Design a protein with these regions (language model features):
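Alpha-helical transmembrane bundle of multi-pass membrane proteins
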Residues: 2-271, 278, 288-539
């Protein structure tokens, strides 16, 4: 087992009792809040803790092979969105000429997938609570597969739009369910790394899209863009087949009262059987506190009823804080303009003075390599340094990079000679902006959205936050070119830099650190400390 990091807080001691094998004997806590106060720093806050028998042992972050395999298979779903983002940046160059469509139609075509993914995001929470996390992943892949086939065979703009709509719904399902499933499967000390894998695979997909553009761009125009879009069907098929080897989320199984199955999954994804029993006890306590399962139950008819009311109509103060944090980080993720910059990167580089199509596509490959490298780097250190430091570094770096891009673009607007240094500044600034995004907002948004909601609200709370993500992304994708041409690219990038500066302040004040805490413990950050000390979110 590979060690990737460990928490470095002082030693704290906690005594535990093993669970008997009988499900009916599982302990049920009626006071989850007080229980959290007593047990806040178990495996998550201590470098050393006590083994269930009471013997002190080192708690190290290890990569469980079974959890890693499940995380990789689920995250493969995210390649679908990444590939579409990357491939569309080059495909639109040929679609515009082949189908003879306007810039406005291009914006609608590009943005439609993100807007329609809102449908999948909103529906995914209820769907995953009803049919399970695994089968929601299958549904996402199957829906995107149909969309990819429609796009690859599209004879006209309207047919192509139909494919984008269907694929968008599949992307919406995928964006919510992949990080949620991985978060519920992962041990606390490696959850940051494993839950950031969907973003890693998004970047792998973007890079594959860029490579596809570069490789297929020399084919006849009527064929190249159709192949670029149609190739997305292959990862969708791989996901649908790979899900057969994935376990169901143990937390979903607990909510459905299937405690025996949950225990078997936990034994596979835990270091020891004792650890599995302790994790199961925490899950049962959280579920029974919500009234979804009792210790003696073997089944449950819970399907997520009453969740929207609790989230939107009668939220408690802690839930409001969680909503603000989750929606805020998703809003700023897309308000950064990252997706729009990637979608329209050839237009951005063309405005910077690069006009050869092959060169335009080639520069995007370099950008894709930079994004993929830095998201891998961030994922490896997420559980060592924590969410907040990387998020603040990434957002502040984006603000500076976008300001530099705005400066270079503004200079080129007023220059007749297009000096090489200004062109180089724009290229470097774009690569820096997407790299800082990959360090911070890219992976951490998915990690944070999937881990801060309590068990009963996690699926639909995540779907609500990610729906905001999709809406902002779609609006920006549909308006980026029009606004940029009206106020200039330079002014647009200065506006995005300002947005990232505001986002950095928001993250500093409203997002607490969740590194190393179990999903059941994270709620204490919003429930206990915040109630007792309003400034606790700053720590």
């Amino acid at each position: 087992m590979q060690v990737i990091g460990s928490a470095m807080e002082p030693e704290k001691h906690h005594d535990y009792h093993l669970l008997p094998d009988s499900e009916s004997a599982l302990p049920v806590g009626n006071d989850l809040k007080n229980g959290r106060r007593r047990e806040r720093a178990t495996e998550s806050e201590s470098h050393k803790s006590k083994h269930p028998e009471g013997t002190p042992v080192h708690r190290k972050a290890y990569l469980n092979k079974f959890a890693l395999s499940g995380a990789i298979l689920a995250s493969t779903n995210s390649i679908l969105l990444g590939y579409d983002i990357g491939v569309m940046s080059g495909a639109v160059l040929f679609i515009r000429e082949n189908l003879n469509i306007s810039s406005t139609q291009i914006e609608i075509l590009v943005g439609s997938l993100n807007v329609c993914s809102l449908i999948g995001s909103l529906a995914s929470g209820k769907t995953s609570d009803c049919i399970g996390r695994r089968y929601t992943i299958v549904l996402a892949a199957a829906t995107f597969l149909i969309g990819a086939i429609l796009m690859g065979l599209a004879p006209s703009f309207s047919f192509l739009m139909a494919g984008r709509v269907v694929a968008g719904i599949g992307v919406g399902y995928s964006l919510m369910i992949a990080p949620l499933y991985v978060a519920e499967l992962s041990p606390a000390l490696t959850r940051g790394f494993l839950t950031s894998l969907p973003e890693v695979f998004i970047n792998v997909g973007i890079l594959l899209g860029y490579i596809s553009n570069y490789t297929l761009s020399s084919l006849p125009q009527y064929m190249n863009w159709r192949l670029m879009l149609g190739l997305a069907a292959f990862p969708a098929i791989a996901v649908a087949v790979g899900v057969l080897a994935m376990p169901e989320s143990p937390r979903w199984l607990v909510m459905k009262g299937r405690l025996g199955e949950a225990k078997q999954v936990l034994i596979k994804i835990s270091e020891t059987k004792e650890e599995a029993e302790l994790r199961l006890a925490d899950m049962v306590k959280a579920a029974s506190f919500s009234g979804h399962v009792s210790a003696s139950s073997s089944s449950s008819n819970w399907h997520g009823q009453g969740v929207w009311k609790e989230l939107l109509l009668t939220p408690s103060r802690p839930i409001r804080r969680i909503l603000i944090a989750a929606i805020g980080v998703n809003f700023f993720m897309q308000a950064s303009g990252n997706d729009a910059v990637i979608y329209y990167s050839p237009e951005v580089f063309r405005d910077a003075g690069i006009h050869n199509k092959k060169h335009l596509v080639g520069v995007t490959v370099i950008m894709g390599i930079a994004k993929t490298f830095f998201v891998l780097l961030s994922a490896l250190f997420l559980d060592r340094f924590g969410r907040r430091p990387l998020l603040l570094l990434g957002s502040a770096g984006m603000a500076i990079s976008l300001a530099g891009l705005g400066l270079g673009s503004k200079f080129l607007e007023y220059s007749n000679s297009n000096p090489d240094w200004a062109i180089a500044l724009c290229v470097v600034a774009v690569c820096a902006a997407v790299s800082f995004f990959s360090i911070g907002l890219g992976p951490i948004t998915w990690v944070y959205s999937s881990e801060i909601f309590p068990m009963r609200l996690r699926a639909q709370g995540s779907s609500l936050a990610i729906s905001v993500n999709r809406l902002v992304s779609g609006v920006l994708a549909m308006t980026f070119l029009s606004i940029s041409r009206k106020i200039t690219f330079g002014a647009m990038f200065f506006a995005l830099a300002g947005m990232m500066a505001v986002g950095t302040v928001f993250f500093y004040y409203y997002l607490p650190e969740t590194k190393g805490k179990s999903l059941e413990e994270i709620g204490a950050l919003f429930e206990d400390e915040v109630d007792e000390n309003p400034k606790a979110l700053l720590s």
